[in-house]
Swiss-Prot record:
It is a multi-pass membrane protein. It comes from the Bacteria. It is found in: Cell membrane. This is Putative integral membrane protein YxzK. The chain crosses the membrane at residues 3-23, 35-55, 58-78, 89-109. The lineage of its organism: Bacteria, Bacillati, Bacillota, Bacilli, Bacillales. GO terms for cellular component: plasma membrane. Pfam families: LrgA.
Amino acid sequence: MKVIRIILQVLILYVFFMIGEAIQHLFHLPVSGSIVGLVLLLICLGLRIVPVSIIEDGAGFLLSFLPLLFIPAMTGVINYPSLISFNGLMLLITVVLSTIVTIIAAGFASQLLEKKAKKREEKEKCSKHVSRSL
């Protein structure tokens, strides 16, 4: 039963991909259709049109295979050592800086979400206390 649920959830994600591809081709956008599909999925999740539970297991399944997708890219880089030797320092600087920026952005985002969660908990505690006193 879980296998069928994962397959259906992956199909839902694939539908978002296909819709994104169609929009990209229809409007000749300079952005990949897969990115358009991800933005549509993000909007639908944010507006709660699509609940997370509908895609959670399928997305987790796909994420478990994500490292395998980096192997062909790294093999391609290894096949062209002249690019690495010529632009190696620039690549290293770019990777290090982008990693630092990503870590900082993730830290700020997690702190913001934690503050919102604490405020929500405080409001719930306050409303329970007020309702008990009435």
